[in-house]
Amino acid sequence: MPWLVVMKPRDRLLGVGARGAPPRYDPAAMRAIALFVALAFGWSWGLGFVASGMKATAPMPSAALMMVAGFGPSLAAGAVAVLSSGSAGLRAWMLRCLEWRVGSGWFLLAFLAPPALMVCGLALHSALGGPLPALPDASQIPLVIANFGLVLLIGGPLGEEFGWRGYLMPSLTARTNWRAASLVIGVVWGLWHLPLFFMAGTAQALMPIPV
């Protein structure tokens, strides 16, 4: 690609300077980031609106297409990695996504903290006089577990995080601090999800839009 300089695959993908110093502004790297955002939004929004339009007449294909639409960020990151450095760039991106950066205790905490907080919230709700939700009967437990696994793996991490965390975060922190990068990603992430609040049948459509 004419707008990319010749560097090592990982450095080229992140836009790091030839001597390893992260430039504050690198036109080639910024174009790569802009391309990632455009591809992520174009894929997810385009398929999402198509899926929403066919929901009334073909609910199952619509649901499947909506799930595929959620892979926009990860697919966009892979595409930009290939355009930047070919197969070597794709391999460098995938290795970075799968890199074990913290101890196993942090993964255990991340896995257990959400259900623990939910239990605490239900306990507080009950202590204040609120009713507890009905538990599923035994026949529904396998379905609940399968749904949990589907959402845990496919509903976000595989489709989104390889893009937001695997590509966009390191690309931004190569030229700014992590706080500013996190703020930018938060805005992009929010805008990427925005159409779901206006599509009937999505979980977001049942939620208010916070201001």
Language-model segments: which ranges?
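Membrane-interface helix/loop boundary segments of multi-pass membrane proteins
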Residues: 159-186
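Membrane-interface interhelical connector segments
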Residues: 163-173, 197-208
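Short, Lys/Arg-rich, polar N-terminal cytosolic tail immediately upstream
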Residues: 10-30
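Small-polar-interrupted transmembrane alpha-helices in polytopic inner-membrane proteins
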Residues: 44, 181-194
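Specific transmembrane helices
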Residues: 24-157, 185, 198, 202
